[in-house]
Amino acid sequence: SNFNKEQMEEILSICEVRPTVLQTELHPYHQEKELKAFLKENGMVAQSWYPLGHGDKALLEEPLFAELGKKYGKSSAQVILRWHIQDGNIVIPGSKNPTHIQANFDLFDFALTDEEMDKIAAMNKNARYYTSTPEMLKRYAETVPPVDEQK
């Protein structure tokens, strides 16, 4: 997860089993259009990590989402999740709140127009909430899950 295009090219050049999904940070402030185009060209899809911008109030309180929420009778979070779906992202939002979990399923009785999708596309700032470092990647690579203990 969280690989960039260059890292994915390297993986594809040496892997025996091709990945089909890349989990990466995606939300209206960080849309990764170039990476997603590369994934599509290579038969892969993106799964959105931090689909609601890590709960950033600035994103959730964007006037456009309030306006669209009012139009469709939805919350800003539901509008953002609908954008993900229409933009081709796999989206699995997390919540411990039963009301939010139910609301996360209530996305299929409306669709954003092309113009609305374009307005959201214009919000892209290439702003990440998570940045990995070489040290972190090394730690992840060295992690050995306790598979034998799980038997």
Regions found by a protein language model. Give the residues of each.
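Beta/alpha (TIM)-barrel catalytic core signal, keyed to glycine-rich beta->alpha loops juxtaposed to Asp/Glu
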Residues: 1-151
